[in-house]
């Protein structure tokens, strides 16, 4: 059973081309407290240095860092969104590594998500394991008025069936994206991304769990993002993935609600 905690706020600058420095979600497990001078903390610093240097070339990296005592071993993963450049990936991972040590400096189990990248480390080996426990949902509180709600549900479902099927193919490395015309003037844009350590089956399962929120928390809303440690799904009424159409991009200013998911 998941617990939902809802918060509403005014989002003044949710733009289609989010800067790497705009963090979306961070989680510091308070059951994994460590001291700043501990060997585990030093191993985390070493692990982050590896992730910062090695992730941008392929957009993904898993690694470990340990000393003589395996009890102090730390596992790490970093991944950039599959449609961004190596330069943007590098910037995002650097920012993530710096920020996570600031906000989770006393925890050995931490994760941080940006629009362009995701970074996680833990003393528990999470690599290759599906995780849809803790998560976060952002949605636009405005309802869809441009088309009939049932038609919107059908179009949204068809689009995400398509891009989910594309994402689980090995050649696409967990990324699926696409768009569909709702009216001559309104286009629905969608993107899915799972972490590349997952099997095709686990990736598909994560997407199914995340997309399920479209019919509940986000039902008939003009935009929604569902974030888990293992995957990320999003739709908007404006372009937000690359390559962008400069003529159609711009800010979406309005009231956004967030829902925190916990196991």
UniProtKB/Swiss-Prot annotation:
Domain Gnk2-homologous: 22-126, 132-240
Chief location bin: secreted
Position of the signal peptide: 1-20
Record localization: Secreted
Disulfide bonds: none
GO cellular component, one term: secretory vesicle
Keyword hit for Repeat: yes
PROSITE patterns: GNK2
Family: Belongs to the cysteine-rich repeat secretory protein family.
Protein name: Cysteine-rich repeat secretory protein 55
Annotated organism of origin: Arabidopsis thaliana
Taxonomic placement: Eukaryota, Viridiplantae, Streptophyta, Embryophyta, Tracheophyta
